Amino acid sequence: MRSRQTRDRYRLLPEGYQVTPGRNRHPGTMVGNTPVLWIPELSGTSDPDRGFWAKLEGFNPGGMKDRPALYMVECARARGDIAPGAAIVESTGGTLGLGLALAGKVYRHPVTLVTDPGLEPIIARMLTAYGAGVDMVTQPHPVGGWQQARKDRVAQLMAEYPGAWNPNQYGNPDNVGAYRSLALELVAQLGRIDVLVCSVGTGGHSAGVARVLREFNPDMRLIGVDTIGSTIFGQPASNRLMRGLGSSIYPRNVDYRAFDEVHWVAPPEAVWACRSLAATHYASGGWSVGAVALVAGWAARNLPADTTIAAVFPDGPQRYFDTIYNDAYCNEHELLGGQPPTEPDEIASPLDAVVTRWTRSTTVIDPTQVVS
């Protein structure tokens, strides 16, 4: 029963105002139950009622990867894979690192994060503030790029730290299982979902969310969003400006058979979408968010009007204040080229051409199974 003081406080609220319980004993309980927001498609060329639902994972303390960070640690502890107080060592481009720093605080494990010079200074400083060690590699691997260089450094550190545990986000099935909660939240918020649009990096959230949503709608379509220069879907590796999606290695958690089609997006196109979202909806994010919004808007224009489209926005905009939202940076990298075309280029197979701008293919291949 509420105290008199509490009842008096509630009388001050406007009639009909709903209060969501928000008391948390530790920061791990703040993860999840993120909102969805209706986003009319951004091009402005179609019916304003056309749009998609954005799952705003930036409302988590550190972003979407708080979910797998906590879940992977919880599962490892339950299995006895990591001893109480043992070190956690992992490779990260930033977002999982924030989640692991959180998990380290919740479960009292020291955390060392191996990253590269592309990590934004604001994230490096915050990781240090959260108590994590930040280990920076200085040279990319000649074949596997920065990701392989980070993985190699993790292996070195694991040999130096007896009893340390590596989550291995690229191949750990718990990374996939962690997203069941996100999928069930979407079902509770939206009901039947016809199309899911996800960025693809480690492959965890696209596989984990789609698997659960298809328990409710087996015909749901999954659209994967990658960046140009990424090897995940069979393109050759090249320098990648966009972080948070794409890869220069082949993560085992990517479920190639789950995808109905894949889109590659270039940095200027993602920047346009991010800035458009910020200007029109006060809800934006980083490279993955811009790329996903561009593709989800395309789906909203081209699919029947009653199609329910869910798009996962993995983070918020704050860490990108000096890149995506910095005119000097964008001009230096020629990212302010104006509105992209309303339709992507199309290729029959990812092996047919090297893509350099927004491109779509309905043929999805597992490049590790391609015989040259």
UniProtKB/Swiss-Prot annotation:
Keywords: Amino-acid biosynthesis, Cysteine biosynthesis, Pyridoxal phosphate, Transferase. The modification N6-(pyridoxal phosphate)lysine is found at residue 65. InterPro entries: Cys_Synth/Cystath_Beta-Synth (IPR050214), TrpB-like_PALP (IPR001926), TrpB-like_PALP_sf (IPR036052). GO terms for cellular component: cytoplasm; cytosol; peptidoglycan-based cell wall. The lineage of its organism: Bacteria, Bacillati, Actinomycetota, Actinomycetes, Mycobacteriales. It catalyses: O-phospho-L-serine + thiosulfate = S-sulfo-L-cysteine + phosphate; O-phospho-L-serine + hydrogen sulfide + H(+) = L-cysteine + phosphate. One of its GO terms (molecular function) is cysteine synthase activity. Catalyzes the synthesis of S-sulfocysteine, utilizing O-phosphoserine (OPS) and thiosulfate as substrates. To a lesser extent, can also use sulfide as donor substrate, producing L-cysteine. CysK2 thus provides a third metabolic route to cysteine, either directly using sulfide as donor or indirectly via S-sulfocysteine. S-sulfocysteine might also act as a signaling molecule triggering additional responses in redox defense in the pathogen upon exposure to reactive oxygen species during intracellular survival or dormancy. This is S-sulfocysteine synthase. Homodimer. Was identified as a high-confidence drug target. The enzyme uses a mechanism via a central aminoacrylate intermediate that is similar to that of other members of this pyridoxal phosphate-dependent enzyme family. Belongs to the cysteine synthase/cystathionine beta-synthase family. CDD domains: CBS_like. Pathway: Amino-acid biosynthesis; L-cysteine biosynthesis.
